[in-house]
Amino acid sequence: MITNPSNFRDLHDCYDFIEAGHLYRSALPRNLTKQDWDKLYNLGIRYIIDFRSEFERKEDSYECDQRFQHYNWSALKPETGIDDFYFPRLITKKSTKEEVYNSAWFIRKGYKIMPFDNLAYKQLFQLIKEKDGILFHCGSGKD
């Protein structure tokens, strides 16, 4: 059982039409030990895809084991094209009700448009054609 990174799962367990051992989802793989990376490698994973924004990656970075091909493909770009979705920065303890409401609206809208004409997803779908395993992640591995 993989416990680090958190929220790790084989998507075949959720969707049986996905080939087992080919597509995995998790939270960001930070603070992984060599043994953690070995477990991922032994599962056949060879690609790590980070769907977080550039800002998120700068705020919370990690070093990817060199055995893996690592891609940074931001999945959430609002209609403006600005790669700027970092929830902890959108809402703080000092946020007003209006700021919280506006941030929630931004997030809902972002998730409505995210699946359509998304370059990051197109790149993932191209990579799925490869036979090696793929682990993709955002910050928490929940969306």
Q: What label would you give each PLM region?
A:
Residues 1-135:
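Cys-dependent protein tyrosine phosphatase-like superfamily
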